[in-house]
From Swiss-Prot:
GO terms for molecular function: metal ion binding; peptide deformylase activity. It catalyses: N-terminal N-formyl-L-methionyl-[peptide] + H2O = N-terminal L-methionyl-[peptide] + formate. Coiled coil: none annotated. Its cofactor is Fe(2+). One of its GO terms (biological process) is translation. It is an enzyme of class 3 (hydrolase). It comes from Microchaete diplosiphon. Removes the formyl group from the N-terminal Met of newly synthesized proteins. Requires at least a dipeptide for an efficient rate of reaction. N-terminal L-methionine is a prerequisite for activity but the enzyme has broad specificity at other positions. This is Peptide deformylase. InterPro entries: Peptide_deformylase (IPR023635), Peptide_deformylase_sf (IPR036821). The active site is at E150.
């Protein structure tokens, strides 16, 4: 379900929140569940959305801006003002498909690095919206991929941890000023 939070989809020269990048320990720490959905949290959601739009992203998890909360914002159509964003509070994966899809991913925390990642094609999640209402969502295609990518951030995992081709990954990271030593491969 789309969010009711209203944020102008525009790029700001100085977004409200600072991104953290691969190699920063903050990205490796698991996020904590959110106990209370209130106006302070809704302001954080607005700030995260504005930061995401300012950086040309389609998804952002709170740990990427140094906040250890289980909070994700997603907008697959950032250029479409009529399409509201998706806000996921304390998301949990209920089910994933057996069908695996390989597609290229990028990340605001690892600028200019794009690599193929295998993920389940369909994912079903439970979460709370920005008003604290429990919701479920079955997602496919790009939305399923984006949800899984952002949920990884909540667990201290970044997409490069899931890349199979370590040689190409090391070259891409080095070319963009990142160290392969910051990668923590997951099975």
């Amino acid at each position: 379900m789309p969010s009711e939070i209203a944020v102008e989809k525009k790029k700001l020269k100085n977004p409200p929140l600072q991104l953290h990048y691969l190699g920063d320990r903050v990205l490796r720490q698991p996020a904590k569940r959110i106990a209370k959905v209130d106006d302070e949290l809704r302001q954080l959601i607005r700030d995260m959305l504005q930061t995401m739009y300012s950086k040309d992203g389609i998804g952002l998890a709170a740990p990427q801006v140094g906040i250890h909360k289980q909070l994700i914002v997603i907008d697959l159509e950032p250029d479409n003002p009529a399409n509201p964003p998706l806000v996921l509070i304390n998301p949990t994966i209920k089910q994933v498909s057996k069908e695996i899809c390989v597609a290229q991913e990028g990340c605001l925390s690892i600028p200019n690095v794009y690599m193929d990642v295998k993920r389940p094609e369909v994912v079903e999640i439970a979460y709370k919206d920005e008003n604290g209402r429990p919701k479920t969502l079955k997602a496919t295609d790009l939305l399923a991929r984006c949800i899984q990518h952002e949920m990884d951030h909540l667990n201290g995992v970044v997409f490069v941890d899931r890349v199979d081709n370590s040689l190409t990954l090391a070259q891409e990271l080095s070319k963009n000023g990142f160290s392969y030593q910051a990668v923590k491969p997951v099975a």
